[in-house]
Curated annotation (Swiss-Prot):
UniProt membrane topology term: Multi-pass membrane protein
Family: Belongs to the complex I subunit 2 family.
EC number(s) recorded for this UniProt protein: 7.1.1.2
Membrane spanning residue stretches: 11-31, 40-60, 87-107, 109-129, 134-154, 169-189, 213-233, 253-273, 278-298, 310-330, 338-358, 386-406, 422-442, 466-486
Gene name per UniProt: ND2
Protein name: NADH-ubiquinone oxidoreductase chain 2
Keyword Transit peptide attributed: no
Length: 497
């Protein structure tokens, strides 16, 4: 009985969400098809209920007594890193729902299934974060991927959305096959799937035969390539720009922040814990991905004319910084990677809050901005929005004293401790180059001339509040930067074991 309670206790938030998903599904099916009620639209109701469910799940997680143990026959882990990451996921999801709520009303996404899929995707992300076994890792990632394929193609009347979902499905299925094949190779050669057991096994790597070492290296490479694909790291980034562009904007925001944190947490467990004895090997792969990600993300962003493709390439560049922090393989690198992800997520929430609120009014209808040229002379239409976006872009570029500067600084300091001077100089140079396309956008807002005047649609109060909150966080983090630094360091302590 005690073992059963220890298994149930760490996943109480997931059980709570799944039970509510079943209730919402029954509620949606019964009421949306009711003739007496006139076939009501339930999307707004389910959106508010989803927000309440996630709020209650965060409270359940936050007030749980912390237990540093594994559960479900060591399939899941509940350490300090997992505990804090789950809290961050719930806060991000709440912010995402509040930011995108007005967009869903504007775009008339009236299907109640939308919110059920979002809740299931969040559960899948939570399972990925807690995974402590190759089997649960694969099943959780597949659970997440199947939902993401549907969400990417949710706009059935849009050719771009259908293309995005199909392309994501084909390439995602290929990467899942690599993950499964790599896991089966490792299990076939070792008979182990648990992360901690694999870490103990690989301490005797020098005693293995050459054929076994080649097989294990091949299996590990396939797993690493699959996870880098899910993280949209170059040269495995081909799907990201098209999927970001074709998906609904709210889903694009979801793709750009939620899976990043989940896959990063999984990478940290695999590279730092299970396969730490392969460090000389996986450092080469990670280093190649860093160079390609930062170079392709930076240079490709120059030629983009659409917002979502621009953000896709910008996020690929930031993935390079995630991996750069992992490259050091020490506690400072883990801490700086967590710090960088937190700053990145808050910045992306702020930028998408701007994109979702920037709607232009044309007689009898209003439309959302899609092109970067819509920013021309924005300072004349709405100076407050122009200043807000300027600060967010400066933060993405790493201009002091904004949050993005400290995030990049901590990553570079962790890399310099390992005396990796060459990659550090390369990253600094590419960061300087990336400043040009951010400054180019700022120039168009303040100094470019406009051919015709545009009328901005009134900004939603909730979106303006969230935009202001994220802006204050990014702008004034230097006043109490130790708070986030302590949090990220505390989360990294679980890897000391």
């Amino acid at each position: 009985m005690n073992n059963f309670l220890y298994d149930i206790y760490p996943i109480l938030p997931e059980i709570f969400i799944l039970s509510n998903v079943c209730i919402l599904l029954v509620y949606g099916v019964l009421f949306s098809s009711s003739i007496k009620l006139g076939y009501p639209l339930l999307a707004q109701n389910l959106g508010l209920l989803s927000c309440q469910i996630l709020g209650c799940s965060f409270i359940i997680t936050y007030y749980q007594t912390f237990l540093n143990l594994s559960s479900w026959s060591d399939f899941f882990i509940n350490d300090i890193f997992t505990f804090k990451t789950k809290c961050l996921i719930f806060l991000m999801c709440l912010g995402w729902i509040l930011i995108t709520f007005s967009y869903i009303n504007y775009e008339r996404i009236n299907s109640f299934e939308y919110w059920i899929l979002i809740l299931l995707a969040i559960v899948a992300i939570l399972f990925i974060i807690q995974s402590y076994d190759l089997l649960t890792m694969y099943l959780s990632i597949e659970f997440q991927s199947l939902i993401f394929y549907i969400l990417a193609s949710f706009k059935r009347t849009s050719e771009f959305s259908t293309e995005a979902g199909l392309k994501y499905f084909v390439l995602g299925a290929f990467s899942s096959g690599l993950l499964l094949f790599g896991s089966s190779l490792i299990y076939g050669l070792t008979g182990l799937t648990n992360f901690l057991d694999l870490a103990k096994f690989f301490t005797g790597m020098p005693m293995l035969e050459l054929s076994s070492w080649i097989g294990l290296t091949t299996g590990f490479t396939l797993i690493l390539v699959s996870l880098l694909f899910k993280l949209s790291a170059a040269p495995f980034h081909m799907w990201a720009p098209d999927v970001y562009e074709g998906s609904p904007t709210s889903i694009t925001l979801f793709f750009s922040i939620m899976p990043k944190l989940a896959i990063l947490s999984l990478l940290l467990k695999l590279l730092i814990l299970s396969f730490h004895d392969f460090i000389t090997f996986w450092r080469i792969i990670i280093l190649i991905c860093i160079i390609f990600s930062i170079m392709i993300g930076t240079l490709s962003a120059f030629s983009q004319i659409k917002w979502k493709r621009f953000i896709a390439y910008s996020s690929i560049s930031h993935v390079g910084f995630f991996l750069l922090a992992i490259l050091s393989g020490n506690l400072e690198g883990i801490s700086s990677s967590i710090f960088y992800v937190i700053i990145y997520v808050i910045t992306m929430l702020g930028i998408f809050s701007f994109i979702l609120t920037l709607r232009f009014y044309n007689y009898s209808y209003h439309y959302q901005t899609r092109y970067l040229q819509d920013l021309i002379s924005l300072s004349r239409f709405n100076p407050a929005l122009a200043i807000s976006l300027t600060l967010f872009l400066f933060s993405m570029a790493g201009i002091p004293p904004l949050g993005g500067f400290f995030a990049k600084l901590f990553v570079l300091l962790s890399v310099l401790q390992t005396k990796s001077f060459g990659i550090s100089i390369f990253v600094v140079l590419m960061s300087c180059i990336s400043c040009f396309y951010y400054i180019k956008l700022i120039k168009s807002m303040y100094f470019s001339s406009i051919n015709e005047w545009k009328v901005l649609y009134p900004i939603n109060k909730l979106n303006s509040l969230l935009l202001g909150f994220s802006l204050l966080f990014i702008s004034f983090i230097f006043y109490d930067i130790e708070l986030l630094s302590i949090l990220s360091t505390l989360m990294s302590f679980s890897f000391l074991n």
